[in-house]
Amino acid sequence: MALSKNSNSNSFNKKKVSYISVPSQIINSLSSSSLQSLLVSPKKSSRSTNRFSFSYRNPRIWFFTLFLVSLFGMLKLGFNVDPISLPFSRYPCSTTQQPLSFDGEQNAASHLGLAQEPILSTGSSNSNAIIQLNGGKNETLLTEGDFWKQPDGLGFKPCLGFTSQYRKDSNSILKNRWKYLLVVVSGGMNQQRNQIVDAVVIARILGASLVVPVLQVNVIWGDESEFADIFDLEHFKDVLADDVHIVSSLPSTHVMTRPVEEKRTPLHASPQWIRAHYLKRINRERVLLLRGLDSRLSKDLPSDLQKLRCKVAFQALRFSPRILELGNKLASRMRNQGQYLSLHLRMEKDVWVRTGCLPGLTPEYDEIVNSERERHPELLTGRSNMTYHERKLAGLCPLTALEVTRLLKALEAPKDARIYWAGGEPLGGKEVLEPLTKEFPQFYNKHDLALPGELEPFANKASVMAAIDYIVCEKSDVFIPSHGGNMGHALQGQRAYAGHKKYITPNKRQMLPYFMNSSLPESDFNRIVKDLHRESLGQPELRMSKAGKDVTKHPVPECMCSDRQQQEQQSDA
């Protein structure tokens, strides 16, 4: 009897709310007669009536009936919940997966097949209700705001007020059109970007005109892109017109001049060292060619030169129009449903080779990495005397997919968070990313988001692909790199300059002991890891707090100031 009444109650509520826990496919498969047989008891015979007339006089039957009525009342009260208080599943039960949708655009083709859920999805009346536990509290709703909450920027804003002496020197420097600096930049796109910044500063130090830097073909990626293929050349010239004279090529008067080539610029070279070693030579030969500038110029420069660094990195180096257009489109597709997180995952084969680390997948993959490293020992970057385990414990290795997943869960990233992942194809293929895709199914890269044919013009252009990743990551609400590197450093400074947008720096060295402690309860692990990152969320950090910090990574205080400081600079101008 209790079962039939409870079914009747659910049938009645079905007309009013959409959180019926019975899937609609089952309900629709039942005929009206079948439903009736569930809800209505068969007629009793007269013999049964006589039995009932006897039974109602029995006190035990009365107590039993009262118990059933009370039980039914409690059940009805427990299930008759206000539907507004129930969070509905965003992904209703369905026999087919909905495709990616971008406001009416064609569906995108997935490159690695990693997108598990549609970006755009709507609920329906046959969605199953998500039952709230822990006293009815929805933990996702309580913690989601904390994850997306932006750090306090303390009122710092971009301010590049150059001194009167700098502006005075500019007049004579810009008139000088007889000596030229040629620079060849190497590495990946973000590494080349850093060297272009330093090339502009060195040209300013020498009082020379700068020929648009030459991008050296990378031995790993083989990208033959030129400066104008990646960056907006005319914008680059216009923004720096008051600082350095920039030309696309050597003038005819200097074409036949054999440039003096220099490859041995030391690490952390100061402006005084640059002038002492290069000024006489460029004045005499009129053309100086520099190579191997990566991290050669000192990070600690006079204030005006630091501001020039910021001006180049954050204002002058804008991507070319076609790259910017596609990058903005992909970012818009991620933004369609609100906030999104971007990850820079460093799990490519060359990354494991260069870092001296192992992917930890299978012995076969470890052997692939070790063999490649033995064949090309020059690819290993620094500290070659350290073992893999020593590097791992020192926090020098990229986080694996499982480690990134545990970090995100500890930081209380919502399970339905939309995640854009940047980077090349990981060693081991898409299976390597399964810990992430299982926990966070809305997981996309540029190939998932792009429409058919959109990326074809950039095939085999690693620098262009890196630029597209950069744009989508820069526009995200939260950014997390699995490893340091040039892109992570560039984005840290870019996001700070844009108002200190949230940037989470994984504290790998301090996290690792807890990753390795299998006996630590998950709740304790999450609490500890979250506490380790309270000061690593992209808050303003003074560059001068430690010598050797890059101003394009930490733009405060040389390139950003408070409202009061900005007013003081304007009054001094």
UniProtKB/Swiss-Prot annotation:
It is found in: Golgi apparatus membrane. It comes from Arabidopsis thaliana (Mouse-ear cress). This is O-fucosyltransferase 20. Keywords: Carbohydrate metabolism, Cell wall biogenesis/degradation, Fucose metabolism, Glycoprotein, Glycosyltransferase, Golgi apparatus, Membrane, Signal-anchor, Transferase, Transmembrane, Transmembrane helix. Glycans are attached at N138, N385, N517. Residues 563-573 have a biased composition (Polar residues). Residues 547-573 are annotated as: Disordered. It comes from the Eukaryota. Pathway: Glycan metabolism. GO terms for molecular function: glycosyltransferase activity. CDD domains: O-FucT_plant. It holds the Pfam family O-FucT. One of its GO terms (cellular component) is Golgi membrane.
